[in-house]
Amino acid sequence: MYYPFVRKALFQLDPERAHEFTFQQLRRITGTPLEALVRQKVPTKPVTCMGLTFKNPLGLAAGLDKDGECIDALGAMGFGSLEIGTVTPRPQPGNDKPRLFRLVDAEGLINRMGFNNLGVDNLVENVKKAHFDGILGINIGKNKDTPVENGKDDYLICMEKVYAYAGYIAINISSPNTPGLRTLQYGDALDDLLTAIKNKQNDLQVIHHKYVPVAVKIAPDLCEEELIQVADSLLRHNIDGVIATNTTLDRSLVQGMKNCQQTGGLSGRPLQLKSTEIIRRLSLELKGQLPIIGVGGIDSVIAAREKIAAGATLVQIYSGFIFKGPPLIKEIVTHI
């Protein structure tokens, strides 16, 4: 397969420059006959989750296609679902560069991107042009300059704008790179946010005559008590699903490696066990009442199967996709 050669060339570049170059090429071919260059035939393995039928259980995690620029090209690679975003109400540049780092020996990434995106209106225009026949999730967040106490307003603005175009909506309250964002995972702040989101979802269902499920994305760094509280809140508010997990602040498995001390969220193989354990514990709390989308360090069929064995209904990849490329999609979907 050609990807090892592509990866070797891309890894000569700064990680963010490599990402920009790749997306530049994907933008050129998306929606054109040249999409055939990245198209892969994968088996159909339908899975029902959150009331939706996914053509296979593998999705692309949020963060790679923040603005929905390459939906068709990425979809052609065989994903059953794509989660685009995180998108915010207004465009924002994100944190200062450099802000994305490879831990090559660990097959991990550290990012402190900070929700850089072109805004929700731009994303919606891109979604309108796409022809992806899988499930499209749209991951939403708050602007950096929106005070945390007003954060729910940003989520409601985004919900209103994406509702008509989303297969499901993901609520990102677990990125470590937006100051104060993770506090929305706890106690009254979480209850307040989920109440507002559920009310908005009900209102939008009436307006659009369709029900779009909402999933909440959580951090892997929650302690046992916090995880129990989150599970309880999600169930009480009738949230449709939970995405476990986002990136971690834990560096215990990458000590001494190049870039390990960079601030930001760590993803990839070093996150694999931690996220699987969160899924296992969450599954025990939820008792099958709420589906789990498992993400974190999936870089093989075995890693994907471990997430499902722990309690996930669907799985997503990101860092594994960077390190292994499109062949990983076919491998996982074929053998999962």
UniProtKB/Swiss-Prot annotation:
Keyword tags: Cell membrane, Flavoprotein, FMN, Membrane, Oxidoreductase, Pyrimidine biosynthesis
UniProt remark on cofactor binding: Binds 1 FMN per subunit.
Cofactor: FMN
Pfam families hit by this protein: DHO_dh
Active site: S175 (nucleophile)
Biological process terms in GO annotation: 'de novo' pyrimidine nucleobase biosynthetic process; 'de novo' UMP biosynthetic process
Gene3D superfamilies attached to this UniProt entry: Aldolase class I (3.20.20.70)
EC primary class: oxidoreductase
Binding site for FMN: A62, G63, L64, D65, K66, T86, N139, N172, K217, T245, G268, G297, Y318, S319
Any GO molecular function: dihydroorotate dehydrogenase (quinone) activity
Protein EC: 1.3.5.2
Pathway membership, UniProt: Pyrimidine metabolism; UMP biosynthesis via de novo pathway; orotate from (S)-dihydroorotate (quinone route): step 1/1
Localization, UniProt: Cell membrane
Gene Ontology cellular component terms for the protein in this record: cytoplasm; plasma membrane
Residues that coordinate or bind substrate: K66, N111, R112, M113, G114, F115, N172, N177, N246, T247
Catalytic activity: (S)-dihydroorotate + a quinone = orotate + a quinol
Subunit structure: Monomer.
Name of the protein: Dihydroorotate dehydrogenase (quinone)
Organism, scientific name: Salmonella typhi
Underlying gene: pyrD
